[in-house]
């Protein structure tokens, strides 16, 4: 059994350490990472991927994958405890450290203000942004169907982030700061990382690698000599 109350208390404590002030010097951002987690063997293995893209070209320069035994079952609201061990293992393998990380998941748009983007950002002390595919908490006004439509995401009077339609006929993204990024800058950075898909390029790559998707396998076959990979980890 897991002490969920103790983990929730830890979340509240760590959330108090989150900074929503920009820790990014826009003129000196050279590398942006995407981070995502998938699961193998019916959830027994956590597979984390971190993709490093050069900015502003958004060209992939490195990726790392780590597999670790899953230490926590799926518990709503405590997902970051399940995911961060594998993320830290992938982080430790990186040759190029990023200036900013976009994480597939929530930042402060979380009932206790500590989604995986915030938790991971605190642990590695790098600016992070949560880019989630669904809402965990907060309310927003109806969103127009046009590309670029945006509404603030609020919990009572506190703005947690943004709801942004990045692609037509697609569900919106839920964007919130993780750590060392302001609410306003979170949306702007995600918008700078788009390349015509629903997801920004950093998390689109990380999602494909973490889940070992067919498009990633096709890319591997076309790029067998890519220097940024760790072939033994795939």
UniProtKB/Swiss-Prot annotation:
Name of the gene this protein is made from: nfi
GO molecular function annotation: deoxyribonuclease V activity; magnesium ion binding; RNA endonuclease activity, producing 5'-phosphomonoesters; single-stranded RNA binding
Family recorded in the similarity comment: Belongs to the endonuclease V family.
Subcellular location(s) per record: Cytoplasm
Annotated site residue numbers, Interaction with target DNA: 74
Requisite cofactors: Mg(2+)
Function: DNA repair enzyme involved in the repair of deaminated bases. Selectively cleaves double-stranded DNA at the second phosphodiester bond 3' to a deoxyinosine leaving behind the intact lesion on the nicked DNA.
Species classification: Bacteria, Pseudomonadati, Pseudomonadota, Gammaproteobacteria, Enterobacterales
GO CC aspect terms: cytoplasm
Organism of provenance: Yersinia pseudotuberculosis serotype O:1b (strain IP 31758)
Record's protein name: Endonuclease V
Binding site for Mg(2+): 36, 104
């Amino acid at each position: 059994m897991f002490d969920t109350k103790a983990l929730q208390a830890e979340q509240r404590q760590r959330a108090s350490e989150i900074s929503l002030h920009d820790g990014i010097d826009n003129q000196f951002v050279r590398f942006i990472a995407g981070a995502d987690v998938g699961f193998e063997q019916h959830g027994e293995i956590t597979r984390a991927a971190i993709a490093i893209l050069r900015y502003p070209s958004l060209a992939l320069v490195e990726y790392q994958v780590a597999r670790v035994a899953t230490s926590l079952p799926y518990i709503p609201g405590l997902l970051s405890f399940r995911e961060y061990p594998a993320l830290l293992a992938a982080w430790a393998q990186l040759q190029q450290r990023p200036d900013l990380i976009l994480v597939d998941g929530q930042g402060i748009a979380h009932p206790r203000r500590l989604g995986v983007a915030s938790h991971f950002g605190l642990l590695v002390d790098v600016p992070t942004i949560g880019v989630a595919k669904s809402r965990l908490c907060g309310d927003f006004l109806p969103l127009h169907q046009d590309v670029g439509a945006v509404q603030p995401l609020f919990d009572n009077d506190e703005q947690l982030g943004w709801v942004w339609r990045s692609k037509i006929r697609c569900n919106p993204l839920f964007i919130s700061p993780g750590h060392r990024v302001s609410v306003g800058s979170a949306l702007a950075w995600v918008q700078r990382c788009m390349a015509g898909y629903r997801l920004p390029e950093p998390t689109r790559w990380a999602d494909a690698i973490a889940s070992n998707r067919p498009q990633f396998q096709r890319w591997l076959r076309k790029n067998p000599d890519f220097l940024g990979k760790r072939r033994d980890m795939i």
